[in-house]
Structures are given as structure tokens and as C-alpha cells.
UniProtKB/Swiss-Prot annotation:
It catalyses: N-acetyl-L-glutamate 5-semialdehyde + phosphate + NADP(+) = N-acetyl-L-glutamyl 5-phosphate + NADPH + H(+). Belongs to the NAGSA dehydrogenase family. Type 1 subfamily. One of its GO terms (cellular component) is cytoplasm. This is N-acetyl-gamma-glutamyl-phosphate reductase. InterPro entries: AGPR_AS, AGPR_type-1, NAD(P)-bd_dom_sf, NAGSA_dehydrogenase, Semialdehyde_DH_NAD-bd. The gene is argC.
């Protein structure tokens, strides 16, 4: 299968290159960006020498349609919403890593403060959390966000089984700096990040409606959640710490059973007896989940950790590609966590 990447110079685009280089069924045939056009990717990023020596090209939908069988959009929000339309009209498969096709138009505009894609385009896309969405044969995939992935995988088994008081959910999520993308900003300046810890977009992060929308598919009465996001002084990784109260007569063994039922046959979710750590998933497509119960307060704490650039972006995108095509779900994704 031949694929193209739009948004090649961003963190997620570069991670896609590394993954696809090890994918037995995929050939990367073109790469596109607005920067460094005409230069070989390996000249811009020498660590990719011998991995990807393709030249970066301007975006040209027709050229991609002629060359490839599928396109990945690894672009900032607000880009794919306009560029994807030509592909949809041509019935040409898309996996969009941005948030442009995850939400209804009015919700997207409210939370992203940008013009949404047309409703007829949005209706074509399937929101694809790999462990829960049947995407075989689908053509248009909205890849979940990084915070959303970690949080949803932690909560869906408990919400679906009716084990927790959904109005008690509090999520304290923390991300490495790559989650903010490459755009220059005061908050990502080295002197503001190094040896620091800061909360941002409190109650206003754009992944909040995505998470609630997904959970409501498992409990129609699911209310809004309290959700905070903070920046960690690390390059990559997300830790979502979820607090919730158990319903009456629910035992800790019921929680363990719910996670086992949900994930025992899922190759990229590891439910652990110990509490997860970022180092154990960095460089991989794994999600590690652990939990602990406080009998005095009736509060269950669930911790979910992922690599924000892999399971939270490019890794899950390739996982979805594999599922779309009916291939082995793990193809191209046999990355051992780097740990250090």
C-alpha cells in the first residue's frame, strides 16, 4: 500500500516516517509541508538519513491521489478541515491526526475557535479509538487526541460497566512538551519549562468535549467532567490521573475484572498491578494502566500513561491503518519502550 504524509515536519509527521519505515505492507511515496519544500527530509533531519530521503513537496491533492492509496494528515488543527474535502469527494482514504474531524461543527468551533469542516465532510469520518472502534473497511478516520486516548482508555471499562459515579470524575492530566507542537510560544520557552511545572487551559482544553462525547457512547447520561492539563518538563509522555467514586456495593475486584475483560486481548494496553510510569511506555505504542482504591474516601484512582507522539498520535494512526486494512494490528508497531 502506498501512502503520503501531509505535515511531515511536525513531531507526529516525523514519528510516522519512523513507524512506516518498519511497516512491511506500506511504502511512503510522498511527503508534504509548507516549510523546507524542495529539500530532502534527511537533509533537514539528519537522523533520518537512509530512512527517508524523499524530497519535501508542496501540498497537491491530485498528485497525492495519483501516487498514493491513502493520506495521513499530521497537521495542526484548522488545516485538514479545508484540505481534506478534495480527498473525500474523490473517495480517497484519509487518517487525520488533528482534531478537525472529531467533533460536530458547532462543538469544534466553540472549543478550537476555528472554522469547522463542512457537516457533509464530518459525517463521513469515524472517530477511531483503536481498542473500541471497528474501522475495517472504513475510509475516513479521525484519530483521537493524546489526552483523550489516555483518559478514555482509563475510563471506558468503568463507565461501560456502570461501576462508578460518573458525576464524581476528576482528571488531572500531564503532558510532555511535544504535546504542544512545534509552534513557538512563551509557555514552551526553555527557561519557562525547565525545572518548572505549569497548568494550562484549565477547564478549556479542546480534548474535553472529545472525551465526554466518547464516554457518552457508553453511558448516555454521562455528565461533563472536571479536567485539568499541565505541562511536565519532559520531552514526551502523558500521565492521566483519574479520580472517581465507586457506586454502592462495587468491589475493587469488580474494577479489576472490568479492566481484564476490556483489555486482556488488546496487544497495546497493559493493565498492571503496580502504578504506571512514563518511562515504561516512552518510545512505544503501549498504554499502561494501574489503579488503587482508598477505602476511607471511596475514591478509586486510575493512572494511564502513554507516549503522546505514538499511542497518542502516530502509533495509533498506524494501528488504525492496520485495522482498516484487516492486517495484523501490531504491524510496524513492535517498538520496545526506550525506558531511558
Amino acid at each position: 500500500m502506498k501512502v503520503s504524509i501531509v505535515g511531515i515536519t511536525g513531531y507526529s509527521g516525523l514519528e510516522l516516517v519512523k513507524i512506516l519505515n518498519n511497516h512491511k505492507k506500506v511504502e511512503l511515496v510522498s511527503i508534504h509541508a509548507t516549510k523546507e519544500v524542495g529539500r530532502r527530509l534527511s537533509d533537514v533531519y539528519p537522523y533520518l538519513a537512509g530512512v527517508c530521503d524523499l524530497k519535501i513537496e508542496d501540498f497537491d491533492a491530485q498528485e497525492i491521489i495519483e501516487k498514493a492509496d491513502l493520506v495521513f494528515f499530521a497537521t495542526p488543527s484548522g488545516v485538514a478541515s479545508s484540505l481534506a474535502e478534495e480527498f473525500v469527494q474523490a473517495d480517497f482514504p484519509i487518517i487525520d491526526l488533528s482534531g478537525d474531524h472529531r467533533l460536530p461543527a458547532d462543538v469544534y468551533q466553540e472549543w478550537y475557535k476555528k472554522s469547522p469542516a463542512k457537516k457533509m465532510i464530518l459525517n463521513k469520518f469515524t472517530y477511531a479509538l483503536s481498542e473500541y472502534t471497528d474501522v475495517k473497511g472504513k475510509k475516513f478516520i479521525a484519530n483521537p487526541g493524546c489526552y483523550a486516548t489516555a483518559t478514555e482508555l482509563a475510563l471506558i471499562p468503568l463507565v461501560a460497566a456502570g461501576l462508578i459515579e460518573t458525576d464524581s470524575i476528576i482528571v488531572d492530566a500531564k503532558s510532555g512538551l511535544t504535546g504542544a507542537g512545534k509552534a513557538l510560544s512563551e509557555s514552551s520557552h526553555f527557561v519557562n519549562v525547565h525545572d518548572n511545572y505549569m497548568t494550562y487551559k484549565l477547564n478549556h482544553h479542546q480534548h474535553i468535549p472529545e472525551i465526554v462525547q466518547t464516554l457518552q457512547a457508553f453511558d448516555a447520561d454521562m455528565p461533563e467532567i472536571q479536567f485539568s492539563t499541565s505541562l511536565l518538563p519532559v520531552n514526551r509522555g502523558i500521565m492521566a490521573t483519574v479520580y472517581c467514586k465507586l457506586k454502592k456495593d462495587v468491589a475493587v475486584s469488580d474494577i479489576a475484572s472490568a479492566f481484564a475483560k476490556a483489555y486482556d486481548d488488546k496487544p497495546f494496553v497493559r493493565v498492571q498491578e503496580n502504578l504506571p510510569e512514563l518511562h515504561n511506555v516512552i518510545g512505544s505504542n503501549f498504554t499502561d494502566i494501574g489503579f488503587a482504591y482508598n477505602e476511607k474516601t471511596n475514591v478509586m484512582t486510575v493512572i494511564s500513561v502513554i507516549d503522546n507522539l505514538l499511542k497518542g498520535a502516530s502509533g495509533q494512526a498506524v494501528q488504525n491503518l492496520n485495522l482498516m486494512q484487516g492486517w495484523d494490528e501490531t504491524e510496524g508497531l513492535h517498538m520496545t519502550p526506550s525506558y531511558l
